[in-house]
A protein has these predicted regions:
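ATP-binding N-terminal substructure of ATP-dependent carboxylate-amine bond-forming enzymes
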Residues: 1-120, 124-126, 130, 148-157, ...
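Active-site nucleotide/adenylate-binding loops and adjacent lid/helix of ATP-dependent enzymes
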Residues: 2, 6-10, 14, 82, ...
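Generic enzyme active-site microenvironment
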Residues: 115, 170, 208, 291, ...
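Hydrophobic beta-strand scaffold residues
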Residues: 113-114, 142, 169, 329
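Phosphate-binding site of ATP-dependent enzymes
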Residues: 186-268, 272-275, 296, 301-302
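Solvent-exposed alpha-helix faces
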Residues: 25-26, 196, 278
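ATP-dependent carboxylate activation and anion-phosphoryl transfer catalytic cores
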Residues: 266-348
Length: 348
């Protein structure tokens, strides 16, 4: 891999763009020879000086801003530029168009190599309801859920029905991640507040409500290799303090949560969770690497969702799990880049 081969693309227009900056900081440190391109919240793209990226502080809470005028007004313009020709893009994007298949389609149309899943699998994974249906079809246990549609009254009625059957709910965006926009519904008052706030965001943001399962929270990475083999990484366990949720602050700022890698669960549960994650990865048609969130209830592991471009920050689960199995981050990144090139070559 030469200095001219790789472009780390990060930032983006989604509400997960700050996590993307933190991922890019970590990836750029491990791949010092790569170029770094920043997509601003307005969609414009500009090469980012490495020193600027490295010096940016409080990435989870502060937007990165580059001085001057953007090099290209849009990602399409950047990908059409001569600077993109023949490059391999390492996608350090999270959420929105960076993870829902939009960016992937733009790269595919131009025959450019990129890491992670293709556009079709990305779109499937980003839609939680669609992903859950595909996982269930593959034999994975899921929980009852309902998409919240209509006005606040209709949403409240749907929440009340689900609440009556299950006693506690989780409400979250159908297309989103990093625990942004998460609501825990424990009673009528919570249901009313969630219905009002979700209705205020419709139709721009679609939400689903699903039954809450009491149990152990696990998350499991799955990694593809050049030899065609696929493996589950060691499970991570999330312990949440009473009264808190594994929301953005818990996930990235460490408030009220404890992460354990490897998870401290019985071997049979550990292996069942790994098998579930591999099944979900395959059911969605994913490539490269994913991370699947699971809750282990009284009846065993239950599928929640799959992240097709999981975080690679210093605090993220994939780096934790790679370290737990004894794999350094650089060889993992290099293999993902090699997989990206191999896919591009197959599709030519």
């Amino acid at each position: 891999m030469s200095a001219n081969d790789v472009i780390i693309l990060f930032g983006g227009t989604s509400d997960e763009r700050r996590v993307s900056v933190a991922s890019a900081q970590n990836v750029a440190t491990v791949l010092p020879e790569a170029e770094v391109w920043f997509q601003a919240p307005d969609g414009s793209v500009t090469p980012c000086p490495r020193a600027t990226l490295a010096a940016h502080q409080n990435a989870y809470t502060t937007d990165l801003q580059l001085p001057g005028t953007a090099r290209w007004p849009s990602l399409d313009a950047a990908l059409d530029a001569g600077e993109a020709r023949g490059k391999t893009f390492f996608l350090a994007l999270h959420g929105g168009q960076g993870e829902d298949g939009t960016t992937q389609r733009a790269l595919e149309r131009r025959g450019l190599a990129f890491t992670g899943s293709g556009s079709e699998a990305s779109a499937k994974g980003f839609d939680k309801e669609r992903a859950k249906a595909l996982a269930a079809k593959a034999g994975v246990r899921t929980v009852e859920s309902v998409e919240l549609t209509g006005d606040a009254g209709a949403m409240l009625s749907a929440l009340q029905g689900l609440l009556a059957r299950h006693g506690r709910l989780v409400v979250k965006p159908i297309r989103g991640g990093s625990s942004v926009g998460l609501y825990h519904v424990k009673g009528p008052e919570d249901a009313g507040r969630a219905a009002r706030e979700v209705a205020a965001q419709a139709p721009q943001v679609a939400f689903l409500a699903e039954a809450f399962v009491q149990g152990t929270e696990l998350t499991v990475g799955v990694v593809d290799s050049l030899d065609g083999k696929r493996r589950a990484l060691p499970c991570s366990e999330v312990r949440v303090d009473p009264g808190r949720a594994f929301d953005f602050e818990g996930k990235y700022l460490g408030k009220g949560t404890l992460e354990l890698t490897p998870a401290e669960v019985p071997p049979d549960v550990f292996q069942a969770a790994q098998a579930l994650a591999v099944t979900a990865h395959e059911a969605l048609g994913c490539e490269g690497y994913t991370r699947t969130d699971i809750i282990v209830g009284a009846r065993g592991p239950v599928y929640l969702e799959t992240n097709t471009l999981p975080g690679l920050t210093k605090a993220s689960f994939i780096p934790q799990q790679l370290a737990a199995e004894g794999t350094a981050l650089r060889p993992f990144l290099e293999e993902q880049l090699a997989l990206a090139r191999a896919r591009r070559d197959r599709q030519r």
